[in-house]
A protein has these predicted regions:
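Conserved N-terminal segment of class I S-adenosyl-L-methionine
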Residues: 1-98, 118-121, 148-150, 154-199
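Histidine-centered divalent metal-coordination motifs
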Residues: 113
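A conserved beta-strand element that flanks and buttresses the S-adenosyl-L-methionine
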Residues: 106
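Hydrophobic adenine-recognition pocket in adenosine-nucleotide-binding enzymes
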Residues: 110
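A short helix->loop->beta-strand "cap" motif at the edges of active sites that frequently abuts
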Residues: 62-63, 128-130
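Short "lid" loop at the C-terminus of a central beta-strand within the Rossmann-like core
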Residues: 138-142
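Conserved beta-strand signature within the Rossmann-like core of class I S-adenosyl-L-methionine
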Residues: 129-137
Length: 199
């Protein structure tokens, strides 16, 4: 889960086009959350907490929301940015949570950084009571957009730290091994999936 900072730069150093893309990303995420019966929720891999703040505004009023990351420095930054949200340090490979702890688990822009996403997804689904929202860069669109702006050319547009790559179809197939894909969105240049693990 290294290089989370590359993702956070999209928030902190974003130009107009990037901001529009990010707004579209969270609009699509909000569409997946809307209508869900969510009383407890958590974001794993929260980074510096910018996404945490955006997600908190999408949840139903009164929902209890927590966040965590594996990096203590990022946890402290997330807590400072979100003083009313409990932020903890933990690894996606070994979550300090009981089974079926949350109505909704949100994991955004994390799985592509993991050497063992299957292991992480088993843990994510273990602690989710019903719903999981997952997002990853949509390949090959992600790399092509990087190359179009002459970023990471020597690595053929691959963002540093991205060790897993999925198209929208292959990602839905992958997460479908752990639950039922109820809905998905493809805001440029991501794939976002709503997974039902309560069946």
């Amino acid at each position: 889960m290294n290089d989370k900072g590359v993702y956070q730069e999209k928030y902190t150093k974003a130009n107009f086009i990037t901001r529009r893309l990010i707004d579209g990303f969270f609009k699509a995420t909000g569409e997946l959350i809307a209508g869900l019966d969510v009383r407890t929720a958590v974001e794993f891999g929260c980074g510096e907490g910018v996404s945490t703040r955006r997600i908190s505004r999408l949840l139903p009023t009164g929902a209890v929301f927590e966040a965590s990351d594996f990096d203590e420095r990022l946890v402290q930054a997330a807590q400072a940015l979100n003083p009313n949200i409990r932020c903890a340090k933990e690894s996606l490979y070994e979550l300090h949570r009981a089974d079926n702890s949350f109505d909704l688990v949100v994991v955004l822009e994390v799985l592509e950084h993991l050497e063992n996403p299957d292991r992480a997804l088993r843990e994510i689904c273990r602690v989710a009571r019903k719903w999981v929202i997952l997002s990853v860069p949509r390949e090959p669109v992600w790399r092509l957009m990087n190359l179009a702006r002459l970023k990471y050319v020597t690595s053929l547009g691959n963002t540093p730290g991205h060790v897993r790559h999925w198209s929208s179809r292959t990602f839905r197939r992958f997460v479908g091994l752990y639950g039922v894909v109820r809905e998905w969105r493809t805001p440029l240049p991501w794939t976002i999936v709503l997974l039902d693990v309560g069946e």
